[in-house]
A protein has these predicted regions:
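Alpha-helical assembly-interface signal, strongest on the long, hydrophobic N-terminal helix that forms
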Residues: 2-92
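Short, conserved structural patches
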Residues: 2-4, 69, 73-190
Length: 190
C-alpha cells in the first residue's frame, strides 16, 4: 500500500501546473524589450545628463585657466600703465561668464633685499586689492633681487547645467605670475 505522501493528489497536480505556468512565462518573449527599455532608459538619461554636466564644468575650468594666462601674458608685454578694465573685459569675453561670477585682481610684486613687497594691486569689484602676500608666498616663483613680477589672480564660479544630479557650484581659481618683458616693472594703473 502506498503511503499518503507518495500518492498523486491535488498538491502534486498544483505543483505541476505551477511548473508548467513558470516554464510558459520563462519562454514568453513578448514585452521584454519594453521592460528592458523602462529599466535602462533612466540610467542612460542619467549618464547623458551627468556626462554633459561634467564636460561643461571641465570646459569652464580650462577656459578660465587659458583666459588667466592670456591676460597675464598680455599684461607682461605692456610697457605703459596697464588698462585693467580692458583686461577684465578680455577675461569676461574669453570665458563668456557674467561679471558677477568672476573675481579678477592684478598685483605687481618686487623683491627688495630678499623680501617680496607689493608694489601695487588693483582689483575689479567685488575682489579687494591684495594687502598681504603671505597666503600666496608658497605659490610665488623664485625672483632675483630687484626684479618684479606681475600676478594675475582670477576665479570663476561655474554652475552645473543639471544641479539636481548632486553637483553644486564649482569655483575655479587660477594664479599666473609673469615677469614684465620689456620694462623692469609695470607702472601702477590709474
Amino acid at each position: 500500500m502506498r503511503d499518503r505522501a507518495s500518492r498523486p493528489g491535488r498538491e502534486g497536480a498544483r505543483g505541476c501546473a505551477i511548473g508548467r505556468a513558470a516554464r510558459r512565462f520563462a519562454a514568453e518573449r513578448r514585452g521584454t524589450s519594453g521592460i528592458e527599455f523602462a529599466l535602462i532608459a533612466p540610467i542612460l538619461l542619467l549618464l547623458l545628463l551627468g556626462g554633459t554636466t561634467v564636460f561643461t564644468l571641465v570646459r569652464d575650468s580650462r577656459t578660465a585657466e587659458r583666459a588667466t594666462y592670456t591676460v597675464s601674458d598680455l599684461l607682461s608685454r605692456s610697457t605703459t600703465k596697464p588698462d585693467l578694465n580692458a583686461s577684465h573685459a578680455l577675461f569676461l569675453a574669453i570665458t563668456r561668464h557674467a561679471a558677477a561670477d568672476v573675481r579678477f585682481r592684478v598685483t605687481s610684486v618686487k623683491k627688495v633685499k630678499d623680501k617680496m613687497v607689493i608694489d601695487w594691486s588693483r582689483a575689479q569689484a567685488p575682489e579687494a586689492p591684495l594687502a598681504d602676500l603671505a597666503p600666496l608666498s608658497a605659490k610665488l616663483p623664485v625672483v632675483a633681487d630687484g626684479d618684479s613680477i606681475l600676478l594675475v589672480e582670477t576665479s570663476l564660479t561655474s554652475r552645473p547645467l543639471f544641479s539636481y544630479l548632486g553637483l553644486t557650484d564649482q569655483t575655479f581659481a587660477y594664479l599666473s605670475a609673469n615677469r614684465p618683458r620689456f620694462v623692469p616693472a609695470l607702472p601702477a594703473p590709474d
